[in-house]
Amino acid sequence: MSTDTDSELDLYIGAVLGKKAENVVVLDMAELTSIADVFIICSGKSNRQVNAIAEHIQVVLKKHKIKPLSVEGTKEGHWVLLDYGHVIIHVFYQAMRDFYDLDGLWVDAGRIMTPALKKLQAEEKAPEENDDM
């Protein structure tokens, strides 16, 4: 992935992380499907958090003049899909994510690691390292 693409994806990822989405995975779908170039998959701990994450994503991206083509699933809050054309964001309640297992379904997709995700991983690792002391 190019630096331009990474910075664009970091905009989406930053929006996803704004309401503490968990288990964020970015899949390179370009070679596997014509639906989208990238899937961003994340989880929330409750249907209320799932909806808050989805709403926050829309607010943040709208400030950058990026609007979804379609939004589905907000009524139930179990699986919200935000279609931004080349990027599709799946926000799951964790039990639904486990059930549908998109991560496993698209196991052949490459994982994309952007600067924002690298920073997130480092922050998640830091408390674990302190626990070892």
Annotated model-derived regions:
Residues N23, L27-T33, L69-H86:
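Glycine/charge-rich, flexible interdomain linkers and switch-proximal surface loops
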Residues I41-S43:
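Short hydrophobic/aromatic beta-strand micro-patches
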